[in-house]
């Protein structure tokens, strides 16, 4: 189904993203592709549907054939009926006014009769479990909901090969199970060939019969899933997270040990009182109360669409509450907003605009008169950006862009750092280095609010967990109802592994 021979892809500056790579994938295979951030995984995905070379400034050599045709001899539109590609950032491929319009766009452009367009959109909605979103505005969806819509839109084209670039990175447990269950069904019932790019191996690894590990533009390892997963030393050296067997995942509670629920005695940095907020007539948050104190490392968890990003936007001053109050500590009120709070968006492209990585990291401090070359060097180094400092941020992988955005925020030394789903595009090694550095800052007073669906990250770093449910925040402590509900959600997450 996929035949790649001696593929080399070079971006501006002679940077080889893919280096003499050859690969065959047979019809009906389910292949998991993983590797360190920036190793060329997403570039390879874009070669499969013709975006490279037809819609990219990258230079391509070698041959890529899918379903018997060469990608260089077909247009991107022609390849869309053979290869469906779902990007890491779903917002970059959604443009329909409603979800139904989005799913119908591709089939309509194939010239299909209206009844078949309806049949295809209905199938895609059901397959991804988003029938309830059919009439929703795509711009008003959460990131996780957008991801599922992007997958459904690709499915409506009925491709023979489905390529997904970190499709579960922004999904909650229910969404992850729905997407992976859909992929298993599509392969089983329709013989679809599936290539999934992931850093989190447990879930996708349970479905894959083959694993590819890339490094520096080459296929380093290629073999059966169990055989590759046994090579733990190689995985560790590459910064790849070891897959957790289901029984190990179920035995690990949210907290590794009991954590006291009493506060640290310090006055809150920021306090939300009786907040009601949303984007239309129906509020997302209702009578929400939340306080974050210095030296706290707080995790905010909850389903997609629960309002976690809305909380982040309120704290960052990007959204005004419809009712209630967001009050900062009196010692911080006179500081510019960028010194009080730093928000890492889910989509790093929304906060990158300079020509080089170094300029991006220095931009904030330069404008506030806070530049410290020593601190900038430390941050660039910890973020793993030393060798990329003169590169254009827009030419980097999503994982690298995420670290550039985080470094630019840390350079301003905000009192409160908010990380909204920081795992997208990150291998475990890069993520651990950054999180360990943040933990050291936390020990010196830095307050951190982590928004994530990754419970391994929560378990390792958070001191306190808050569950956002039905528009309100609940404190999660051992023995409480919210604590039991979260662990029950984890159990449901791994049901898909034995499906």
Segments predicted by a language model, with ranges:
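H-loop/switch region of ABC-family ATPase nucleotide-binding domains
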Residues: 198-199, 452-453
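Conserved ABC ATPase signature
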Residues: 137-141, 145, 392-396, 400
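The feature captures the beta-strand-to-loop junction immediately N-terminal to the Walker
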Residues: 34-36, 301-303
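Helix-to-loop junction immediately C-terminal to a conserved catalytic motif
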Residues: 49, 316
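Conserved ABC ATPase "signature" region
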Residues: 115-133, 371-388
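Catalytic Walker B motif of ABC-type/P-loop ATPase nucleotide-binding domains
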Residues: 162-165, 417-420
């Amino acid at each position: 189904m996929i035949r790649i021979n001696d593929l080399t892809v070079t971006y501006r500056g002679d940077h080889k993203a893919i280096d003499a790579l050859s690969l065959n994938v047979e019809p009906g295979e389910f292949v998991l592709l993983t590797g360190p951030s920036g190793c060329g995984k997403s570039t390879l995905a874009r070669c499969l549907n013709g975006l490279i070379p037809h819609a990219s400034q990258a230079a391509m050599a070698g041959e890529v054939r899918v379903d018997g045709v060469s990608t260089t001899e077909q247009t991107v539109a022609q390849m869309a009926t053979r290869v469906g590609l779902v990007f890491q950032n779903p917002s970059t491929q959604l443009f329909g006014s409603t979800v139904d319009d989005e799913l119908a766009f591709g089939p309509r452009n194939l010239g299909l009769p209206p009844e078949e367009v309806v049949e295809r959109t209905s199938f895609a909605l059901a397959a991804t479990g988003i029938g309830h979103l059919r009439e929703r505005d795509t711009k008003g969806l959460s990131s996780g909901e957008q991801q599922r819509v992007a997958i459904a839109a690709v499915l409506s084209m009925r491709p023979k090969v489905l390529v997904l670039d970190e499709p579960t990175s922004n999904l909650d447990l229910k969404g992850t199970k729905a997407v992976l269950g859909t992929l298993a069904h599509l392969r089983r019932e329709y013989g679809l060939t599936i290539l999934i790019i992931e850093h989190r191996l447990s879930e996708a690894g349970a479905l894959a019969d083959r694993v590819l590990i890339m490094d520096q533009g080459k296929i380093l390892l290629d073999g059966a899933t169990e055989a590759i997963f046994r090579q733990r030393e190689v995985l560790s050296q590459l910064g790849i997270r070891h897959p957790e067997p289901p029984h190990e995942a179920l035995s690990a509670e949210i907290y590794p040990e009991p954590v006291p629920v009493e506060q640290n005695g310090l006055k809150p940095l920021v306090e939300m009182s009786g907040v009601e907020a949303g984007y239309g007539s129906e509020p997302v948050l209702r009578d929400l109360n939340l306080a974050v104190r210095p030296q706290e490392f707080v995790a905010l968890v909850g389903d997609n669409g629960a309002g976690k990003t809305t909380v982040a936007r309120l704290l960052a001053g990007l959204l005004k509450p419809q009712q209630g109050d967001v009050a900062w500590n009196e010692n911080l009120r006179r500081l510019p907003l960028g010194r009080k709070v730093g928000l890492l968006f889910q989509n790093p492209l929304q906060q990158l605009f300079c020509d080089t990585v170094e300029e991006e990291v220095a931009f904030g401090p330069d404008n506030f008169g806070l530049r410290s070359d020593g601190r900038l060097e430390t941050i660039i180094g910890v973020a793993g950006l030393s060798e990329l400092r003169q590169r254009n941020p827009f030419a980097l992988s999503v994982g690298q862009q995420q670290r550039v955005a985080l470094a630019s925020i840390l350079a301003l030394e905000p009192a409160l750092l908010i990380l909204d789903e920081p795992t997208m595009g990150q291998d475990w090694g890069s993520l651990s280095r950054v999180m360990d550095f943040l933990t050291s800052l936390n020990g010196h007073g830095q307050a951190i609010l982590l928004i994530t669906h990754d419970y391994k990250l929560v378990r390792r770093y958070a001191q306190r967990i808050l569950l956002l449910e039905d528009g309100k925040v609940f404190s999660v402590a051992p023995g409480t109802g919210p604590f039991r509900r979260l662990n029950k959600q984890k159990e449901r997450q791994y049901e898909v592994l034995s499906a």
